[in-house]
Amino acid sequence: MTFKEKEAAYLSRWKTTVNEAVWDYCDRHGIRRPNRCTTVQPAGTKSLLTGAAPGWHPPKAQRFIRRITFRKNDPVALACLDYGYSIVPSQSDKDEQGRLLDDPFDSRCTEWLVEIPTEVSWANLPGADQVEINNFSAMAQFDFYMQVQQHYTAHNTSATIEFREHEIESLSEAIHTCIGEGKGYISAALLLSLIHI
């Protein structure tokens, strides 16, 4: 059995387990069964507080600053401030000359960005610092996305595929083939990488 076959079996097993558990719970409590139980689609920036990834794609770094949007004076944002997290005005809050505000307590400020230092779960594993995340090819990312799309989720999987200019043709052919053969492709965000240009 190849790695992809093992991965597909693993994802399918978890999809079945999740569906059976949710349906059993709904049936026991007289609740209508949902039409989607397996999702990879965080809803809003506050879901990121739980450590959820913003989609089914590899992070761009092992450690980074995650900015989460809150309305000004939101109780959770104020709690973050009390715990020492940095708060900056939203990118949409500007002065009369169109310049970004720099004081989150300015009366013109309507939203806050709470800056939370974040690291991926595997950041401190031996050898993790030698993984160059930006070297994943577009086809590797697409394959990773399609495995989850085909064998786990019951709708569109939220994913961003970063590609380089020389990968456009092979990626577009792979997408076209998946659509033509009914393999479950719905959509993915495509982002041109400017790192190697």
PLM region spans:
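Internal maturation/activation junctions in enzymes
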Residues: 1-41
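Catalytic alpha/beta core of large soluble enzyme barrels
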Residues: 15, 42, 49-195
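Short capping micro-motif at the N-terminus of alpha-helices
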Residues: 35, 48-49
